[in-house]
Amino acid sequence: MFTLTSTSVTFVGLFILFAWSLVWSVRDAIKAPTVVTRISTWVHVVMAVAMILMVPKSWWKPTVSAIGGPTTPVIIFAICTAWMVFMAAWRSSWSSWGHAAMFAAMVWHLAAMRKVSSLMAAPQHSGMSQTNYNHSGMHSVGHGMQTIINAAMHDYAVAGAPLMVALLAMAIAGLRRAISGRAESPSKVPACHVVATEPLAIRLSGLADFAMAFGMAWMSTELLTPIMPFMAHLHP
């Protein structure tokens, strides 16, 4: 994970982004007019909480242990993703599919973290030494171990690339809405959030979409290093 001392910019930046995502998601959940929208918005609340917990290692590892291990969050968010895909199919729009892609990216991220953790645990079980690692475990390891991890994570990186593109597209769309203040068309608003009609609410809603999507993309960049090595340097 990240630390305030070694990756201070990323640590603080992600906390701010995810905290705002959580605040706005709770606001949407409280104001949700229907059961379907309420379920979808609370799913976003769960995701925002999970992303906050994923920032510091001291929070995420105990959380994973408490809920039964690294497979459990993958299953939880796979179910959430299935719900979001259903919502997108029911009320199809670019925005609704963007939200579905964001949850799919969360499943990919958690599955990749689970894989890296198993790779990093192997030297410990065999009695070999290992250096400390950060969020994804793909940095600050020996050259030999780094080569092994990159080879094992190549397919994960390839699978994650289109999801990262979707996250960035959603982040840009949210930022444009935050800047322009233009409301979404009622017929195109995804069922996963409350329709914002007031100018300030429109901007804040767009900012929340940007925060969640961009934060998810930023947090995941290091998982793409097997195919894009420069991504390892995006966590100052």
Question: Which residues does each PLM region occupy?
Answer:
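Alpha-helical membrane segments of multi-pass proteins
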Residues: 1-236
